[in-house]
Amino acid sequence: MSLPTLWHLHHHGYALQLVGKRWAVPLLAGCSWPVHTLPGTLRERVHLLRGLARDVRTLDADFDKRLNTLLLTNSFSSALDAWLAGLNTVGYRQDGRGWFLTHPVAQPTQPLHESQRFWNVAGPLTSGRPDGLDARTAAPPSSAMPSAHPAADGRPTPNGSAAPAARQAPAFQAPPMDWPTLPLTDDARAAALKLLHQQGLVQDTDNGQSRILPYACLVPFATGTLKGASKAWPGFPTLCRQLVPELPVLLMPGPGPETIQARTDYPDAQTLAGVPLDVYAALLAHSAVVVANDTGPGHLAAAVGARLVSVLGPTDASRYRALGPHVTLIQHHPWPEVDTVLQQVHQAMAAARQH
């Protein structure tokens, strides 16, 4: 959900250095930003941040004269880590961590989509401030990244999802937020194509070119509950049985229980277990349609431009739905019917055939 904010900073001339979970390294490889894995102990985390700051100072003499660190996390520990490393931080004020922030930002007074919250908190880095800590104003670098803006008034978009409304953050007016966009590496695409070959989903044409056959990706896995209700749509097995006669269905479970569930509950699907995250993203991008719960792969599918049918139950869609130009949101209490989802899947498949 942070991708719109990261690209916004990139387009404002920032040379990003990202620090986060290990899985972010392969996932963001196509963005060309250095990604550093956050260590486990306080000493190691502070050492990493100090080292990054030291390296950046050799390239940027004004690094210490302005805000230089954006905290997209809400944790107390992330603010403490950055403060101990001597960084000038901007982040949301909460849980007593405002004392450690150079520029604490007040929490939004109204609920916002998480992507919009990230977008708003980065505002001080992309607009001048009167206290001498102005963000850099270098011209944005040339970029091949598309800049597709969702509607800024919160009305439903043509694909059935709702775009977040731009809201005024403290001391600046947030510009319209871009869609999340995740580019893929050539290596990830090649690895995905190899897996599709192995699954019989690539056809050689008369002119020697390879053609990927239409397939659907189902993401029936969702961990945890919300207000005591499962976030996993119970209609996935039935949907899979109805789709298999029409086109191949691909499942990409994680290790352990998910793999067992995939092979037990979806015997007619083609299961690829343990797929690396960047290759997973490429397989989603090549699909005719993706059907997902409220789960990370749903957001991933939207970010790589896949046609996503997002099936939600108890999730607060206004805050956590997947965003993208090809996202169709289906939500009903307690859950949508299989026929309703299948109808939207057919529409997505028809749109894929037209391209």
Predicted regions and their residues:
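Catalytic machinery of carbohydrate-active enzymes
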Residues: 1-355
